[in-house]
């Protein structure tokens, strides 16, 4: 799997934005990716040093459209802790 295929998108929520102050970044990753693959991809794409990764599987939510019910897509979320001497990751382009 290519590095760009592993990291799908950053997660932009109030909670994940609060973690950025502690150099912790949250990303949606490929459901088949392991911690080792995620670490390698983050270090390769953003040129930073990763010291810790927490990964969680998020279940799909039940959604209804009239009498028809279905589930949203399940996803895998990774919270990445960078080392103190690593540069910050620019999620929204140049500021």
Swiss-Prot record:
Annotated gene: rplW
GO cellular component: ribonucleoprotein complex; ribosome
The keyword RNA-binding is annotated on this UniProt entry: yes
Organism: Pediococcus pentosaceus (strain ATCC 25745 / CCUG 21536 / LMG 10740 / 183-1w)
NAD among keywords: no
Record family assignment: Belongs to the universal ribosomal protein uL23 family.
Domain of life: Bacteria
Quaternary structure (record): Part of the 50S ribosomal subunit. Contacts protein L29, and trigger factor when it is bound to the ribosome.
Full protein name: Large ribosomal subunit protein uL23
Single GO MF annotation: rRNA binding
Keywords, ordered alphabetically: Ribonucleoprotein, Ribosomal protein, RNA-binding, rRNA-binding
GO annotation terms (biological process): translation
Function per UniProt: One of the early assembly proteins it binds 23S rRNA. One of the proteins that surrounds the polypeptide exit tunnel on the outside of the ribosome. Forms the main docking site for trigger factor binding to the ribosome.
């Amino acid at each position: 799997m290519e590095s760009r295929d592993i990291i799908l998108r950053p997660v932009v929520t109030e909670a994940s934005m609060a973690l950025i102050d502690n150099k912790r970044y949250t990303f949606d990753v490929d459901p088949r990716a392991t911690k080792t693959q995620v670490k390698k991809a983050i270090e390769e794409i953003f040129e930073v040093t990763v010291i810790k990764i927490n990964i969680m599987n998020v279940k799909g939510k039940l959604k209804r459209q009239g009498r028809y019910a279905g589930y949203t897509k399940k996803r895998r979320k990774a919270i990445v802790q960078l080392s103190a001497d690593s540069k910050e990751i620019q999620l929204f382009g140049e500021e």
